[in-house]
Amino acid sequence: MQGRADAGEADEEAGAGSGSEAEEDALWERIEGVRHRLTRALNPAKLTPYLRQCRVLDEQDEEEVLSTYRFPCRANRTGRLIDILRCRGKRGFEAFLEALEFYYPEHFTLLTGQEPAQRCSMILDEEGPEGLTQFLMTEVRRLREARKSQLHREQQLQARGRALEEERAGLEQRLREQQQAQERCQRLREDWEAGSLELLRLKDENYMIAMRLAQLSEEKNSAVLRSRDLQLAVDQLKLKVSRLEEECALLRRARGPPPGAEEKEREPDGADLLSELRAENQRLTASLQELQEGLQQEMSRPGAAGSERILLDILEHDWREAQDSRQELCQKLHAVQGELQWAEELRDKYLQEMEDLRLKHRTLLKDCDLYKHRMATVLAQLEEIEKERDQAIQSRDRIQLQYSQSLIEKDQYRKQVRGLEAERDELLTTVTSLEGTKAMLEAQLQRTQGGSCLKACASSHSLCSNLSSTWSLSEFPSPLGGPEATGEAGGSEPHTSEEATDSEKEINRLSILPFPPSAGSILRRQREEDPEPPKRSFSSMSDITGSVTLKPWSPGLSSSSSSDSVWPLGKPEGLLARGCGLDFLNRSLAIRVSGWSPPAGLDPQDKSPDSMPGLGDRWSGAVVRRVLSGPGSARTEQKEPRAEGTGLEGAGLEAEAQQRTLPWNQSSTLPFLLDSKACHSFHEALDAWAKGPGAEPFYIRANFSLPERSDPHALCVKAQEILRLVDPAHKRRQEWFCTRVDTLTLRDLDRGTVPNYQRAQQLLEVQEKYLISSRHRSPRSNLKKRALGLVRPKPAGGTAGDSAEQLPAEPCSELERSLKPYSLVRPLLVSALRPVVLLPECLAPRLIRNLLDLPSSRLDFQVCPAESLSGEEQCTSSAPGAPKAWPATAGLGSRIRAIQESVGKKHCLLELGARGVRELVHSEVYPIVIHVEVTEKNVREIRGLLGRPGWRDSELLRQCRGSEQWLWGLPCSWVQVPAHAWGHAEELAKVVRGRILQEQARLVWVERGSSRGGSGSSSEA
């Protein structure tokens, strides 16, 4: 095979007389002439493998062409490849043309003017026979595949040819049938043409006859007219002749001799006149003669009578034809008159039908409009039904989730109950071992001291037995009211039996005290038992009920007994040595009493300093708890009992008792104890309302969704619902009798019982603890904690520095520390236009712009830049339960006054947060708070609305939900736009505008004491 390029062969065949270098330069010039086309069309990554195989490019050149940053686009890389090949000389040119011949044959034809032959000269020179053999095998495989595809195509074409042959046979048969039909059609066409020619001939003959008849009729008419003219002329001549004769006669008669000179003068004139008359008479005579001669000649002609007869026949024929045509015209006229009458009847009929159709058309149009309106109404109702269905599905899913959570909680409670039973059994075992120890001590004391010490040990043994047999779990502390709060010390028999029944119900079925063991069994157990028994605690017990209650097993155990009476010989050292004394004494024991007066047989001065007398109240359902002192426990101070129990004292005692029932080394304290001021103000308002029965309704707002209860009369209270208090001491239990109030019309919806303030706090605290513990147990607890911003409060004994560092950590920590189940609210009807606050804060600027872009929105809204009021950062008080201080800044009052001045004109769109809303309400400005719900379903639309594609969905959700935590602490009502109420940004702006207009006409519920006084533009509803 030859090793030169195809371009050189083409030039040699063309017979160009220049040398190889001139030819090469000429071809490179041709390549440079179409360089722009080559750089745009060629792919260097496709050409470099073949050029590397031809050894005109090395690895460095390939890397420079394909991987360098100097040539960002493909055109630059192709140009650099052409420059490198031109530097390689003739070999580069030949390899470039062969590559074009293989991969770009159209550009090879453009450069050389030849069709690509795909020869392999360069491969043979560079790679040798092996490379060529491999290349040829590749080509053979390609040709075989092409041959197979060609054979397959031939088979397809043959099958198609057979189908076409069958189709051709069918078409030939149809062609023969069409030819026969065409022959028949040709014969019919010839017959038709012959008949047409005969018809034309007959029409021509008829036309000639008609023309002849018309000519004869014209000749007849002209002859008749001529005869009439001649007859008229004859008559005129005759008349003229007779007139002239009469004149001549008169002239002759009047002729006489001329009278003198006048007659002589008139004689020439008369002679002239006479000559003229004579000449005229001669002329007339001559003309008459000529006429007579012509008449005679006419009369004397032989064919005159026949022509007149012919003319008469023609005239008669014409008359008859005229009669016939007249008759036909009359008939046609009659027919036309009948058709006209029929057409008029049809016109009247059609006009009547047109009027009926018009009436039907109008009726149908009205029916169509009615049906359109009905369809629009039905579609709107369907949309509402779909929304209600979605809401029902969501509520069903939520209820199912709550039910599953309740099942999980039930399982957790069962596990805790089993753990507590195990702990109780271990405690009973410990008490039994203590009893064995005491029995040993009794035996030793009996041998050494005698019977007196034995009696003391026996009394101690009986007291410990009573104490060990009366441990029980109290889920709900019973309220003190009526006979329990005001009864005598001893109590009545029905009350005692009822309390005993309650005690029997609350005693666990396994808490049965075994009989005291003998001395031998005690010694044997001491040898067999481990000297260090396991330590257990009641920490889980407080998580379930919030308190551990010790109820009296016998009437002999007094509620005012001191801790010294429990241990008459002092605290035994053996109990502390066995490892369970400290853990046991660190637990507080709450003893339920039947009255606040001391029982009979004991004087008030016999009370120990550790006892804590108190009084419950009927509002909170608090009971008096007695705290047993021990190592590590705080000493309670003596409180002076008041004459009448108030809600504040009962709440304080209940809170203190609840706090002391918790372990002191636990990592969290009760959050509701830190908001004593809110509890104090709430109970003061409740007492004031109870003392005045004719006062205004007592409205409260549920700040949280309370857990559902098994009581059939209990109300299922959701967050932000308004309740009206009816009976604060319903059946003397820890619950209120309330009615759910419609927030728009103030009408009562349904009635039932709800937990009172302290009971609701306990339920919320237990629920919060369970949620926190479930978050800690889940593998993603830290991630959820960061996403939801939950921060546990520090222990009560922690340092001030630690608490100060942790309190401002997350925005919801303040809400957790002020766990208020209810808030005292009042309805207000604001007549002036209220300002608008949009939440979350990151959506407020964009939503404000979209609201202002809506048509006619600038007539209702305006932007009031409040500069975030600079006072919304509230000062955090040092004490956890202390009230928050409002910062007094110089510019705050002026900005609020600016907002108040613009309230009466338009709705002010404010870019404020939840804390700014507190300042506005404090300044007697009640804004409309609109919160847009952000969920995983609409977070992408929210991100597109903000125009920040770089944000992650989790970051946006965390920011929006962080602002959502502040909503539950607002002192006024707010409205939320759910995620299913809108689909895109424009619809969101319309929905927000509609909610603003709706909220303007509604009542606003404001917390009592949140503002300085009643506003001038608002009134009590």
UniProtKB/Swiss-Prot annotation:
Region (Disordered): 1-24, 475-544, 597-616, 790-809
Assembly description: CARD10 and BCL10 bind to each other by CARD-CARD interaction. They both participate in a complex with MALT1, where MALT1 binds to BCL10. Interacts with TMEM43; this interaction is essential for EGFR-mediated NF-kappa-B activation.
Species of origin: Mus musculus
Coiled-coil blocks: 138-450
Protein name as catalogued: Caspase recruitment domain-containing protein 10
Function description: Scaffold protein that plays an important role in mediating the activation of NF-kappa-B via BCL10 or EGFR.
Modified sites of kind Phosphoserine: 18
UniProt KW Nucleus keyword: no
Residue span(s) of domain CARD: 23-115
GO biological process: activation of NF-kappaB-inducing kinase activity; regulation of apoptotic process
Description of the deletion phenotype: Deletion mice show impaired tissue repairing. In addition, more infiltration of inflammatory cells was found in deletion mice compared with control mice.
